[in-house]
């Protein structure tokens, strides 16, 4: 569960390393926590030098991994080691060209198919 002020790792090669959530944009208008597949507004806290994304830039990201376990439709419970997100543009396309680490199958059902196709492993 991701809420405002939560620090997240970036799971792509867009140039950012760490994000801090500042707002949850989910299906519900006044959703308090973000889960896998929810879109958040975040600020970049740490970035790679000489890359297009810079520190203190406000961006949108989609949550791909959370430490809080979640139950799949088939009854399997999945929990990851870290909280991670992929930076997206206004249309929902990823800004990076690679995605690192495993991501959840639920992203395919939420129309983030481009992120799923870039991922090395889908659980």
UniProtKB/Swiss-Prot annotation:
GO biological process: translation
Subcellular location: Plastid, Chloroplast
UniProt entry tagged with the keyword Lipoprotein: no
PROSITE patterns, alphabetized: RIBOSOMAL_L14
UniProt keyword Chloroplast, yes or no: yes
InterPro entries: Ribosomal_uL14 (IPR000218), Ribosomal_uL14_bac-type (IPR005745), Ribosomal_uL14_CS (IPR019972), Ribosomal_uL14_sf (IPR036853)
Molecular function GO terms recorded: large ribosomal subunit rRNA binding; structural constituent of ribosome
Keywords recorded for this protein, A-Z: Chloroplast, Plastid, Ribonucleoprotein, Ribosomal protein, RNA-binding, rRNA-binding
SMART domains recorded: Ribosomal_L14 (SM01374)
Gene Ontology CC annotation, any one: plastid
SUBUNIT field: Part of the 50S ribosomal subunit.
HAMAP family the UniProt entry points to: Ribosomal_uL14 (MF_01367)
PANTHER family per the UniProt record, alphabetical: 50S/60S RIBOSOMAL PROTEIN L14/L23, LARGE RIBOSOMAL SUBUNIT PROTEIN UL14M
Function comment: Binds to 23S rRNA.
NCBIfam families listed in its UniProt record: rplN_bact (TIGR01067)
Protein name: Large ribosomal subunit protein uL14c
